[in-house]
Amino acid sequence: MTQEALQRLFPEAVVVEVATAADEDDSLLHPAELALMGAMVPGRKGEFAAGRNAARRALGRLGFPDATLPRRPGSSDVHWPEGIMGSISHTRGLRAVACVRTSQLRSVGLDVEEAGPLGDEIIDAICRPEELAALAQSAAPLPSDWPRLVFAMKEAAYKALYPVTRRVLTFHDVRVDVNASQRSYRAEMPDRPAPELQVAGRFHWDDTWVAAGAVIS
């Protein structure tokens, strides 16, 4: 999936970067980032380095050319520079990041996943009954493995919501209303309404990956 395809998931204010093989070089990391790698296995180290280095490149486009990206104290969350919200996502063969200034959008979320079918039990754990019913009847084209796309939408929505709400959510805590013809969706928390949090997103798929982006205005 190309950087251009992922960029189209977001408004113009959001900067997207896709990691390259060169980004797996951990010698490019800052000391505070290297310290986080600890006993990671080699594959995870490359994944971590790729995400941080791609994020630094995205931040450079927003005016933070040499930012260090440690974790928040007591958390696994990335500690973004003041005035920035960002989201890093990775799956086999694809690592990407989305960043935005908080003066333009309140939050952002990105999720990329390998394409492929999910088992019935997993689908039921991800999708609410009304989502299953609505998407099964969609007249607009969707991939055959559309439940995985719903997974990506909810992951992206959660990544946008959590920094704002600090709420730990299950998949069923979030409901997505999908406009398949526009490849867009809205996400809400029906059991814990927060009308001030308008989560809007877009999605994309190809033969290899599915992806979703989400923003809170």
Regions found by a protein language model. Give the residues of each.
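Core catalytic alpha/beta fold that binds nucleotide/phospho-ligands
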Residues: 1-217
